Amino acid sequence: LSGRVDDILLLPVSITFDQLHEVSEYAEYARGGSKKPEGFGWLYGFIKAQGSQHYGKVYVRFGEPVSLSSFLGPVGGSVALDPAARRLALQKTAFEVAWRINQGMPVTATALVTTVLLAMQGAALTFAQVRLGLADGMDYLESRSVPRTASARALTGAGAVRATLDALVAGGVVTAVGDGRDPVWLIGPEHQLAATFYRNSLIHFLLDTALCELAVLRAGESASDAGSASDAGSASDTGSVPDPVGAFWDEIARLRDLLKFEFYFQERDEHRRQVAAEMARHDPSWESRLRSGPAAADELLAGMRPLVSHVVVRPFVEAYRLVADVLAHDDTVTSDSDVVREALGLGRQYVAQRRLRSSESVSALLFQTALQLARNRGLFEGDDLAARRAAFLAELRDLVRRLDRIEDLAIRRYIRDAVGAMPAD
């Protein structure tokens, strides 16, 4: 046909802000508030408010183009003529574009500093402690050639860290307490959801290493369980011993399935190669170390820097656990709005009781994704609903337990590093 186009290139575009004035609206919506309709009036108000004070820079980045024909095939080909194959190809195309947008999105100074402060779950840090908390993360991003803004690269200097803290204080996200012996900075519970807007712009760069940490811990525990079973005589009954490396990959697959509605993953084989490369960067002999027993697995985990799974994965897992708790408590509930309402109330209760480490998990946005996952797993229909909902809750509780272990390890390391960095008397 005359004028026919054989291919279309989709250009991934990422837009990142140092700060946005509307993060408070984002937080209110996450708490269960209503979302304002977006039209020309909203756009005018957005531009006017964004220009009302200095919120920093806007970063526009263009990724590697995606060829539509590489997924859909030639015009009139088998994929184009098969509705099911065409639908799947379009889904894969969308995921590839989204993944490339994420890969091209630069990490900002705002994102790095809020990530460090959110990891403290409301506890304050001195200026020196903020800089110490930034060090490992910045080294990691540098070693992986992750794109960063000039402001993020400048965080090796004290002046850039101070400027970022001051900007976040002015933006109402960070609180400064300066009337004591040492000034300190924190993100209080009332601002944690707003701060996640910035933190979430970088966590996809940390996702694979976060999954690796949890999988290493699971592999070590499987080896320990196998050893206990062998001591009890049950291993000889079955004649088989679980392979820790197999347990590692099983856990990667399970976590990928758990988080598939939150993150854009590459195709399974490609993602497996990415995970293997990530582990090799931490330790080229990681497989043999996993097979050396639980103690070696613990040493492997302890040597991974930085430890990030409690920062990257915990907010999602704890939000899912709240929804699972609601579903397990009442196996007759089926309305999404009822589940979200009950989960919001339960989350606020658990925060007050300190059964949740942070209020950022109490988010209607995360609860909606949790409901997607629950429906995907058939937890709103079928037989044995109560038992399957209880099993889902138990799975998430066990994952939270392992996140607690990694967080405790990260805190002990941070304290050790902080003591080592103190000047001698």
Label the model's feature ranges:
Residues 1-425:
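Membrane-interfacial terminal anchoring regions of lipid-handling membrane enzymes
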